[in-house]
Amino acid sequence: MANTTESAKDRVVIFDTTLRDGEQCPGATMTLDEKLAVAELLDAMGVDIIEAGFPIASNGDFEAVSEIARRTKRATIAGLARAIPADIARAGEAVRHAKAGRIHTFVSTSAIHLAHQMRKTQDEVIEIILKTVTQARDLVEDVEWSAMDATRTDIDYLCRCVEAAIRSGATTINLPDTVGYATPQEYGAMFRQVRERVPNSDKAIFSVHCHNDLGLAVANSLAGLEGGARQIECTVNGIGERAGNAALEEIVMAIRTRADVMPYDTGIDTTMLTRASKLVSHAANFPVQYNKAIVGRNAFAHESGIHQDGMLKHSETYEIMTPASVGLSKTSLVMGKHSGRAAFKSKLAELGISLSDNQFQDVFERFKDLADRKKHVYDEDIEALVDEKLATAHDRIKLLSLSVIAGTRGPQRATMKIEMDGRTFTEEADGNGPVDAVFNAIHEIVPHDAVLELYQVHAVTEGTDAQAEVSVRLKAGERSVTARGADPDTLVASAKAYLSALNKLSAASVRLHAQHAAVV
């Protein structure tokens, strides 16, 4: 990559697929409100294209894509579709209210996929490309075509497919490393060959889409840029199937930090990266690893004495970017029980959080309640309150009260009161430990067949009065959901997380009914 001046920078299109590919990882199901919150933040931070879902997959996905298309102000909204007429028609319908809509259609091209998944000949797949891309272009002006498993596709055949897609009206050509197999050298070379050999390649933008199975997703994406691609498909925090996707925040900050060798501009407001990371982490219920590049808790932490000495003398001795450049503030101890509405609203604005009047009122009341129980309320506490409000806005099952008897002798006992579908239920149950008793009490009120697959606890902030954040993953049949709950009381946080998971199962059409004998 050659050095260049600022004025010569190429524009790289950022295509975010957090709400589609990111949500495909097990347990990452988001509610409609959570998807809307993520989409609105992505739109505000400057993401060019938001792939909002797979409209044919379910009514919920169709509704999410349609609603996001109506709500977003500047981003192009894309709907995914297989190379099937019904899929393409459904995607077109879902994005028709967008300021700018895109249909993203795909078909397998590798020999192994054609033989064992598609069971089609190469010529038959070419015909499918011609027909389905033409259909999509009749519905929208902006059509993206993807060659599924491109990196394991014969290069001669890949060029034939790309030429056919562009000839049929595709405006973007995506060559994904679907199984995370390629190396950066191979991936960049593939783009150079295709662009050189396909006669109409100048009529489309080329796109990268990399999976992280070998830990090369970001490196491969950047190599694709060097090969001539000008769109990068990525997800916040790198969430996605298997080992995940290329991480948006890593892509953007790599380009910004190494502008000397990567002369590109992404148009992203990088000061919103940390907030986006936290929002997606909570909505998808996937914690960010502490040593995650850019947005991990330790990304700007220095413990080594030599490093600390250098940082105190000059920050650039060990930091290649500033915390402020990704939205991290050095101040956090400013809110308490005496803070009023104006101060709280100002703090939300500082954190990049926008709420409706009703949402603000509810979160402010929760903040005052928390401030009465905690000496200091940190930014992370406020973010947890907001995220919990967004996640539970339309819950069928809500926790009203919980008391637990625990000690070194005898069984632990939990007494719980919940509201479900507007009715109040009370039950008590024993357990082998207080958490077991809490979960047993929930099961007494809401019988279900879901299996607990994960239970984790960590502190949101420091100190003995810190809020506990509990993660719970439940599996019912083939459906797996993950949910979180936060509270200074670990047992209350556990109950909130478990009930939130049940609410997600309910939203996914898993049948849940309260025991009528417990009605009070």
From Swiss-Prot:
Its cofactor is Mn(2+). It catalyses: 3-methyl-2-oxobutanoate + acetyl-CoA + H2O = (2S)-2-isopropylmalate + CoA + H(+). Its EC number is 2.3.3.13. Keywords: Amino-acid biosynthesis, Branched-chain amino acid biosynthesis, Cytoplasm, Leucine biosynthesis, Manganese, Metal-binding, Transferase. InterPro entries: 2-IPM_HCS-like, 2-isopropylmalate_synth_dimer, AIPM/Hcit_synth_CS, Aldolase_TIM, LeuA/HCS_post-cat, LeuA_allosteric_dom_sf, LeuA_bact_synth, PYR_CT. Catalyzes the condensation of the acetyl group of acetyl-CoA with 3-methyl-2-oxobutanoate (2-ketoisovalerate) to form 3-carboxy-3-hydroxy-4-methylpentanoate (2-isopropylmalate). This is 2-isopropylmalate synthase. It comes from Methylorubrum populi (strain ATCC BAA-705 / NCIMB 13946 / BJ001). The gene is leuA.
